[in-house]
């Protein structure tokens, strides 16, 4: 493990600790349970899960550090020149599914890849981002989420937030449904356009911004009363989350194709989900407004 990899690993372990501590404090009931694991083909990680809390119905914050002799297809499909290289991958990935339908689901991920081949220069890159999936949209929350994202990107250039915001909108899109998974945020991958230290600093800025983006939303919405009907709608919309993660998500595909730990990879799935055949929201309802207004390509900072 190189000094660069060691520095990234130290940051990611600390990030996992800080995020878990902040979420435990905010929940005020449940605590994370840690499950350390070892990957037979090389590496391992520590999965931390939380459930049935006062606020969080199910959540997970996973650290992994895996390596192998060859990149799996999900990682080399768009970079065929990397096929056959040994790899090392480190990351923190998290998903939080709250009880209350008025509190959005959140997802964040930061990661580092390095692909090596004897006699050739190592190829490295960073990736990550965070995105928000509301069930009952609130404009204040959407603007706050994107404002924090913009502020995290600002030191790295005025074009960074709009570029990675647009990438997030494209990435978290369910092609078979013709709709986005949520209201977006940031997404970046294959980041090595700056020097290593700048790229690493950017990854840290995104990782550190997650708590600032999400906790104020929890605090504003966690005590909002909700009905059984609203809970059913939340479970229906969670189905879209499952569909995206199992069909499109590159992290899920990479984990499964590289022989990762299935329980840790699938920790992102919500605990209660429903599908209704050809279900449609009543026109003009709160449920219809989610797709008609919130799940649209929108510049939230121009509101």
From Swiss-Prot:
Enzyme superclass (EC): oxidoreductase
Keywords: Cytoplasm, Heme biosynthesis, Metal-binding, Oxidoreductase, Porphyrin biosynthesis
Biological role stated in the UniProt entry: Involved in the heme biosynthesis. Catalyzes the aerobic oxidative decarboxylation of propionate groups of rings A and B of coproporphyrinogen-III to yield the vinyl groups in protoporphyrinogen-IX.
Name listed for the protein in its UniProt record: Oxygen-dependent coproporphyrinogen-III oxidase
Similarity remark: Belongs to the aerobic coproporphyrinogen-III oxidase family.
Binding sites annotated in the UniProt record for a divalent metal cation: 97, 107, 146, 176
Pfam family, one: Coprogen_oxidas
PROSITE patterns in the cross-refs: COPROGEN_OXIDASE (PS01021)
GO cellular component, one term: cytoplasm
Organism: Pseudomonas entomophila (strain L48)
GO biological process per UniProt: protoporphyrinogen IX biosynthetic process
Lineage: Bacteria, Pseudomonadati, Pseudomonadota, Gammaproteobacteria, Pseudomonadales
Compartments reported by the entry: Cytoplasm
Residues the record lists as binding substrate: 93, 109-111, 259-261
